[in-house]
Amino acid sequence: MANPETTTAQPNERYAWYVLTVLVIVYMLNFIDRQILSILAEDIKRDLHLGDADLGFLYGTAFGVFYALFGIPLGRLADNWHRVRLITIGLAVWSAMTTLSGFSRTGGQLAAARIGVGVGEATASPSAYSLLSDWFPREKRATALAIYSSGLYLGGGLSLFIGGAIVQKWNQAFPGGGPLGLVGWQAAFLAVGLPGLLLALWVSTLREPLRGQSDGIITPPLPNPFRGFVEELFTVIPPLTLIGAARRGVVPLAINLLFGALVVGGAWAMASITGDKAQWAAIGLGAYAVFSWASALKTRDRPTFQLIWGSPTFLLVVVGYGLIAFTAYAVSFWSLPYVERVFHASKATAGLIIGGSGAAGGFLGVIIGGRLADHLRKTNPAGRLIVALMGAILPAALLAISFTTANLTLYYALQLPMTALSSLALGASAATTQDLVLPRMRGAATATFFIGTTLIGLALGPYMAGRVSAWSGSLSTGVLSLLLVAPISIICLLIAYRTLPRAEASLLERARVAGEPI
């Protein structure tokens, strides 16, 4: 029987664009299911008796930590197994968990469902980035990844429009609760979750390309692709991490335990200060898991470790973009609750305008950013990071105006340009990390990139805005306080800009020195 990885032999440009189209739709649904919580937040807060910090936890941390944590072993599986099958399974899982969100009666139940959504969605981008990197040549890669990333904004925008419309119509039709006692926000979860199960059938029909074909470095399939996945579980999931560390020796186990103790102490201190035990327990779990994984990777796969964790340039890009995401995710989540509270806007109208502006602005931003990044790279190896820097600098003034104006029309008008500018950096940053590793490492590189966007951005940004809002009594203050991280992001990206040409030029040599047989 032919191995599924060898059933497609040569790149096909038309089919590559077809695959990209399907993956954009998948990513749109990914963000519909992820982002719809924003338009439902005020209703959930009222019905489940939650606070702003709780909402930030549900949207960001409960989802984001487990998305990042499971993204590591699933990224490894994407490097070794049939990527189309992996996306198909993940899509079915996260759609089912979104559907279950609609039956939640407590904050704890909703948090558990959000964790499940995070685990399922962790399959998507490592597999998609790897697939697209094999279907598209290097000179078109940032454009392809930017188009794929547009699904983030299209899906996020659609979620607000769909969610607002469903909640309003459902509550009008069933003011005391509908079938099974479901209220509007619960019906919205069901409406966006169930279609994903059908989409999974379509995704399963995609062909699997030869790994490394677009770079001329064909990587043969592994005879036992799940071995690496299981190994990663022992490096990421506590308490399996202790077994994994013990297998490497007494010293690695001692270091792992010491770091774990430091994390527990730090999480306890932050929980004592804020009162948010679940938030900091989850952040501590994520930090410990990432440390355990990186430590094991250094022993087990030194070439991959050296090109990812041993590369200052790679890490600077991850942190730099992660801090952009820190603010962007918070703005994305809190914009709808903000206009409902401050301007008393209707849910359906706000969802339509902010959702439409976010979708259009995000789509334009990632497409223009990707094309501009590819263009600048032709004459400057670090040219893509100029675009990333634009995404870190340009939106700040518009954000400050948006969350201080007393004019609702101006607030709405600023949403499109603000989203467009903040989305410039995504395709450029993602493509930069893909270029800094070998083809077989792309899934792991993508998982690492998303550690920054999730543990730094998603798991902390919305929560911190909510926590500052709760402390200050002002959601505007909560969101604006996040601008304090912008200078750190800019510094990281500027240093990466200076070091990137040397890092790319030395890629193969560093891999050989680390033991890669090339």
Each language-model region and where it sits:
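C-terminal transmembrane helical hairpin of 12-TM major facilitator-type secondary transporters
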Residues: 381-429
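Cytoplasmic membrane-interface "Motif A"-like loop-to-helix N-cap segments
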Residues: 80-91, 374-391
